[in-house]
């Protein structure tokens, strides 16, 4: 194999590898701030900082309790089963009832940042993947 051909092969491999690494970067990150018991037996409150990368999609999912969120920065299109998609922007909040399938997409050029408060069943995962609802 010639030196030039080896460089082409290695270069192509590195470009492909970079694409895989970028493709695997999570679109949504959820960082727990605090978790504590609440007055309802078997429930706990979780406060989390949530970010959706520019162009990122959270993915359809549910929570085992209510989600109350406040958008700190950026914007997103919020898709909630049974409702028309709607845009939420910095300074706005929204509530998603327990078990309702939902998704969010960041169409903006900056990360969408929000604070999410979840009042959920103790011991359950904070979020579970779900199928997209029928149109």
Task: Annotate each predicted stretch with a short phrase.
Residues 1-12:
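Bacterial N-terminal signal peptides that target proteins for export
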Residues 52-53, 76, 82-99:
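Short acidic-glycine-tyrosine-enriched beta hairpin
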Residues 26-60:
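A short glycine-rich, His/Asp/Glu-containing loop-to-beta-strand
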Residues 18-22:
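N-terminal signal peptide c-region/cleavage motif recognized by signal peptidases
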Residues 77, 99-125:
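Ligand-binding loop in jelly-roll beta-barrel domains
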Residues 42-47, 63-66, 83, 99, ...:
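Extracytoplasmic
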Residues 51-52, 63-78:
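Short, conserved beta-strand element in jelly-roll/cupin
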